[in-house]
């Protein structure tokens, strides 16, 4: 059944690691499933969000404003929506279904109740957030290196390899 498959997924999800089977069952009994078609958005930049979503089946892309390529693709067991749920700010990235996707939706009351009642869940959520920060640092470092490389290239004539007008002006 879907509940058995979802329980198995929760067992392998970093967010729910080491939660008791009873806690997982209670969580599932009050959660809802949301099905998305490819291209459908679960979260929209600028809108308010009061849920945390866990990918049960399929995958979603996290797409930042003004950037064509997805920032990250998340699959089974991974979560989205946690930042806007935790800080109450509008959503900072679109979350778009890549495939037919099923999401487990936990509303803010459930999430805050879990945080308050389970140090394990709170710790798991902190680990997920720390992983996201590390990933973003890596992306920023790579982007910064690439920008510096392009700046150097923009100061040299591609044909003659001599410094160009821009180099002289700076």
PLM regions: where:
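Regulatory nucleotide-sensing modules
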Residues: 7, 11-63
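Nucleotide phosphate-binding site architecture
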Residues: 17, 43, 61, 81, ...
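Short aromatic/basic micro-patch
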Residues: 35, 52, 73, 105, ...
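Solvent-exposed strand-loop boundary residues in beta-sheet-rich modules
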Residues: 66-68
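Cyclic-nucleotide recognition modules
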Residues: 70-127, 134
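Heptad-repeat alpha-helical coiled-coil signal-transmission segments
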Residues: 136, 140-143, 147-150
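Conserved nucleotide-binding and Mg2+-coordinating catalytic segments in signaling enzymes
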Residues: 150-170
